[in-house]
Each structure stands twice: as C-alpha cells, then as structure tokens.
C-alpha cells in the first residue's frame, strides 16, 4: 500500500489555520480597534506559513526552543543520560552550614538559555518514568484522495496514552 501523500501533525495544523484564518482572525483580532493586520493580510500570512511548512523552511522561535530544551531535559532524566543537543547545568542555592541544594536546571539550546525549576523537572520525570521517549510513529490511512502516510514523533508514550509536552501554561493555536 504505497502512500500518495505524506503528512505530519504540524502540517495539518498549518492547513487547518489557513482554512480557518477568518475564524481565527476574528477570535484574536476581531474585537481590536487597531489590529496588527487586516483579515486579508492574516490569511496571506497563514497561507505563507503553510507553504513554509510544506517546504520545511527552517524558522527561529524562542518558544519552540524552550519546549525542545525542556523536553530533552525530561527525557535525559527519564533515561538517566546526558544530552547530546542541550547543555544542562545545575543551579544551586546555599542552605547553610556550607551545604547547597539544586534548585533549578539551566538548559542551553540554540544559544538560548532557559531555567527550569528542579521541582518541575522531577515532577515530569517521575510522572513519565515508565514512558518511551521520542517515538516515531506512522500509519497509512486510506482516503478518497488515495493512501496517506500520517507520521510524527510522540514525546512520551505511556502504556495507555500519548503525551505531547508543552512548556506553556495554556496551549492554543498561533502561540509560536
């Protein structure tokens, strides 16, 4: 069953955002007296982002880098290994009597530094301690347009669930 198309989740998100650009624009900017762009400009931006995704054009995003760094820190803790892509350092606090304790982890990725509280890192690592990390998955789906290969990476694969780790307090579209 040879696929006619190959699609991944972020590409589907970009396509959805383009198709629904009028609704998204209204939700985020419809109330504004001085929106940053017109609805037509917003639609054109969504179209260009879709084209850039199709062409896999690299993009620079501090928010995405923070998520990548955090995910790698957690995966390293789960797998008890050192990272090959993120430089990680412990941040200490004096607790008296010449003793120190780790209070955070500093992660450097793409020349950007991020600090994650050790309590948060431990909470995530403990929760996902039995997970399989960064699992590539794919499936061929028959559609009216031919067979489609849908593929992607799972951050954390648990026995009965799939988890996509985010470093934002509220995940919504168009965040980065």
Predicted segments with their positions:
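Conserved catalytic cores of phosphodiester-cleaving nucleases, focusing on short active-site segments
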Residues: 70-71, 152-173
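Conserved small/polar residues in nucleotide/adenosyl-binding loops
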Residues: 176
């Amino acid at each position: 069953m040879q696929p006619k198309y190959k699609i991944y989740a972020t590409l589907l998100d970009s396509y959805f955002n383009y198709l629904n650009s009028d609704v998204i624009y209204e939700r985020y900017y419809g109330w504004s007296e001085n929106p940053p762009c017109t609805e037509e400009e917003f639609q054109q931006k969504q179209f260009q982002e879709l084209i850039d995704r199709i062409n896999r054009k690299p993009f620079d995003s501090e928010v995405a880098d923070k998520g990548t760094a955090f995910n790698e820190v957690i995966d390293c803790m789960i797998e008890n290994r050192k990272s090959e892509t993120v430089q990680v350092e412990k941040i200490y606090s004096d607790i008296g009597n010449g003793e120190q304790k780790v209070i955070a982890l500093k992660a450097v990725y793409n020349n950007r530094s991020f600090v994650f509280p050790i309590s948060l890192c431990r909470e995530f690592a403990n929760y996902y301690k039995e997970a399989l990390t960064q699992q590539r998955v794919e499936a061929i789906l028959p559609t009216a347009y031919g067979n489609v290969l849908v593929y992607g990476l799972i951050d954390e694969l648990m026995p009965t669930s799939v988890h996509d780790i985010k470093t934002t307090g509220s995940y919504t579209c168009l965040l980065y």
